[in-house]
Amino acid sequence: MGKPAKKRIRASRVFFVIYCAAMLWLLFCRSPGWIPGLDYEEQLRANINLVPLYTVKNYLQVVMKRTNDDVLLHCIINLGGNVLLFIPAGVLLPKIWPKQRNFFRFFATCAGIMFLVEVLQLFTLLGSFDIDDLILNLIGMTLGFIGYHLFRRKK
């Protein structure tokens, strides 16, 4: 590997660390997931969605009705953000770690990381466990992975 390639890898690693720090802040430091008046067990039950596409379906219904601009904006930001914010991870993981260039290994790694994030958000009450977030995050990472490989082949 030549000197320019090593510099690009090093720059990618630095960007990845900054990206991870920003994502940790977004995922764990913005707002708590707790609901006043509920004990811990009730909090857990209130902050979990295990039904695939339940939240997505509800958000899409709001988007189609266009009844409340604030709620509409929240739905669009949530759906789009859960995809768009994870595209960089899909680009950077295979760029930095060659073993992550295999799609199945990449997908398993990303699914494991996102599952851990969702579980931590739930049990720390710093968010919720929403299977739809996991699905949308993985879609974003997969789009980044595809983009990485398409761009890499054109070189």
Where are these regions (language model features)?
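Bulky hydrophobic segments
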Residues: 1-126, 131, 145-155
